[in-house]
Amino acid sequence: MQVDYQQLNGIALAYLGDAVYEPFIRQHLIESGFTKATKLHHHATHYVSAKAQAALIERMQAEEVLTPTEVDVFKRGRNAKSHTSAKHTDVVTYRISTGFEAVFGYLQLTQQADRIAELAQWCIKQVDEGRVSSVK
């Protein structure tokens, strides 16, 4: 069944996007030699926390990594009204990270697996090379 991403709100796209992005991070951490649950969780936060995702999407925009459609989807996710409150971060950072996740949800729904992998690998590289920080 094909779902029209344009009919979905940004929160729904972000919900899916969160599930799409995280397996790339988990696989990367396992392949990097982390095997203990506490270490895996600790290191994952450098890639998947709201602060990290906000920093990554801001860098994507600065470096013009995103397509115009992806930028539009990001803005839709960022501007979506959420009834959940941010844990461990401020509302602005949380909303920006929601936009980040919405991009991955959009790419999944439009069956752009290669683009998902490309952006996920780009994000991993940025974090691994210290270009972004999960601390803001």
From Swiss-Prot:
GO molecular function per UniProt: ribonuclease III activity; rRNA binding
The entry's keywords: Cytoplasm, Endonuclease, Hydrolase, Magnesium, Nuclease, Ribosome biogenesis, RNA-binding, rRNA processing, rRNA-binding
Active site, UniProt feature: 18
SUPFAM superfamilies linked: RNase III domain-like (SSF69065)
Pfam families the record matches: Ribonuclease_3 (PF00636)
InterPro entries noted in UniProt: Mini3_fam (IPR008226), RNase_III_dom (IPR000999), RNase_III_sf (IPR036389)
Any single GO BP term: rRNA processing
Any single GO CC term annotated in Swiss-Prot or TrEMBL for this entry: cytoplasm
Keyword Cell wall biogenesis/degradation: no
Subcellular location per the Swiss-Prot or TrEMBL entry: Cytoplasm
Known EC number: 3.1.26.-
Superkingdom classification of source: Bacteria
RNA-binding in keyword set: yes
Needed co-factor(s): Mg(2+)
HAMAP family given in the database record: RNase_Mini_III
Family: Belongs to the MrnC RNase family.
Assembly information from the UniProt record: Homodimer.
General function of this protein: Involved in correct processing of both the 5' and 3' ends of 23S rRNA precursor. Processes 30S rRNA precursor transcript even in absence of ribonuclease 3 (Rnc); Rnc processes 30S rRNA into smaller rRNA precursors.
Designated name of the protein: Mini-ribonuclease 3
Source species taxonomy: Bacteria, Bacillati, Bacillota, Bacilli, Lactobacillales
Gene symbol of the encoding locus: mrnC
